[in-house]
Each structure stands twice: as C-alpha cells, then as structure tokens.
C-alpha cells in the first residue's frame, strides 16, 4: 500500500486536523463547565486525538459526498503512516499520547495488519469502523467530562508496545529522518 502514501492525503489530514480543533464539544453536557476544566491534565492529549480522528472522519464524509477527490485508501494509509512519523518524536507528549491511543485502538480492532517482514496493511472496512467508533468514544468522553474514563483510556492504550518500538527502531537504524529539514536563508539563495 506504499503507493497510497501521498502528499495530498497528508496535507488533507493536517488541514482537517486543524479544522477539527474548532469543532466538537467545548462545554460538558451537564452544564457544569468546560471540557478542559473537567478533564484537567488529560484534556490536551484527548483534544489532539479528537482533532486527528475527526479530521479523518470529515475527509471520509466529504469524499463520500464527492467534495474531496482522490482515493479514500490514500487518506487512510497516509493517516496510519502519519502515526509512525509522529510517534517518532516521542510518545509522552499530547500528540504522541493521542497517536499511541489511536494506534492501539486501531490494532485492537484489526484496522491494520502487520506481516512477518514488518509491513503494515490497512483494512479499509475495519479502519472505517474503528474511525467511527473512536470518534464517538472521544466525543462522548468530552461531552460527559469523564475524567476517569479519559485517564483509563490513556492508561490502557497510550503505551508504546514492544513490537511498535522495534519497528520504530528499524526506521531509526535505516537513518530515515523523522521530518524534512529545509535549509533556508540568504546564503542558501546565494544572496550573501
């Protein structure tokens, strides 16, 4: 599925992640305050997780309506690949925690498989189902202001398991960069 990792899908994932930050529940449904206050130190990672999964949810719905071109497989495969990229920066901060929860949530639901050579393959139907379920789970946790539920979700799924850790180490051993570094400035442009 390597051919399904595309710039356009990565750009859409990033753009709709940012759009999703502005959507969703800001105040708990019981009217007792903000989601941020209710979820305390757990709110940041869950908000990042919400933005990621609702971004993919929006992509899916727009694609179904014919408003977004390309292959849905491009978006899903690129989305999974983005988890590997992001987790390499660290699994302990908000984005990393959200990525680990999502990766393990997807794994538990068979949204992807891993072969003996360490190649991952997205199962489109199971990925779609897991995306829908995780979207609903996160929105419910936020709406209910369920601090204990959010903390339990992170404790259960927000862990870097040995197999993924080994796969990430393989990427590092091959000197595959975490991100692109652009050289900029007057000297690079020959203006000095």
Regions found by a protein language model. Name each.
Residues 1-7:
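Active-site scaffold of zinc-dependent metalloenzymes
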Residues 25-49:
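Post-HEXXH active-site segment of zinc metalloproteases
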Residues 9-26, 51-52, 56:
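Active-site recognition of the HExxH zinc-binding catalytic motif
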Residues 2, 30-31, 65:
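Short helix/loop segment immediately N-terminal to the Walker
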Residues 56-152, 156:
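Long, well-structured alpha-helical subdomains associated
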Residues 139-192:
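Extended, compositionally biased alpha-helical segments that mediate assembly or anchoring
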Residues 44-61:
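An active-site-proximal "capping" alpha-helix that borders the catalytic cofactor pocket
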